């Protein structure tokens, strides 16, 4: 043990040592004989403030604090270390909002603010999830980061603000598969974190910061640093395949005021292409290419949008239907729909809803403890009225009237970036759904719910297809 302690001292020469302490599943400690034996041996009791299990965590942390103190170190821990009572010299890192930092300061302990909900998590989206690289979720624009004040007014009023030692932005990397994506999420938001840490509150000015960002971009370019450039986004969710019947107008915006340029002749836009100033009206099938251009001339990725004129696909005439969908399943791990052609053993059944396509059968032989499988569900979906409908799903494939509408093949099955729209007449339309159980990019597709959501072109929000819309 002494050897390990010496190793810690030598490898981490700084004063502070972060011990973690977050997300410990204390509920499982209730059924752990070793944990309960330690609770009994140490005389840890449940009281009105803490459970015995929370006291156990505090006991462990205090032991660690004493061990590290022998080597001249102080501990930092996530705000869960408050739950069993704070160790004497502990500094709290407040990530679940500001409450942990405030509670720590009120006990005259130091704290570092890093609340995810206040913009201090940089692994979140900073644009429309439909066109941005996959992320854990959340939505944090540059202005939200810059606007955060890490010193709560409550502590200023009580004279406890001296205990807020600083601010930190976390950059969790489970959806950052290369350095480009890591930098893309980090910048320019990390520049805003720097300013809120160093700039007096009365000197903060977001409009001025927004102007100075353009100068910072040039400096980042000089160091070959990748950074986020706001892309042209459509209201109600961006989509790269827009169907229409007679004519349509495409409206775009950016999350920060930047110039947008576009073409309708199939060429990629340049800084000198037509500037977007008003909705673009389209009456014939065309390819719209649009991107953002910075004052330096650097441009965002091109958005290639197919705008297709369609007649309403006619509804199917079916004499007799039964609620639900037909489905067949094959055990195994499949990464492409075409791999299902090799399956030899199928189980056939019917399901009442799209969510029923996803099942979890326990298996000790599979990652995540559930059996992997592929499934194909077929039947009809009832469309309530004539119109253009946008579809979104995390399933591998969705077919409408015998045509492939959405394919998410090979992608992380989160926040689908392959939405499409289609013109449909009122009534029944053939539906086929392909669901593959697998893990891509660290995300198990079995964590999804197999739903499909739709919205009419003139509606703002998607709604899941309901069981009463499904027939076979």
What are these regions (language model features)?
Residues 33-42, 92, 127-130, 344, ...:
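Short secondary-structure boundary/capping segments
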Residues 204, 210-382, 388, 392-394, ...:
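Short, compositionally stereotyped local motifs that mark structural "simplifiers"
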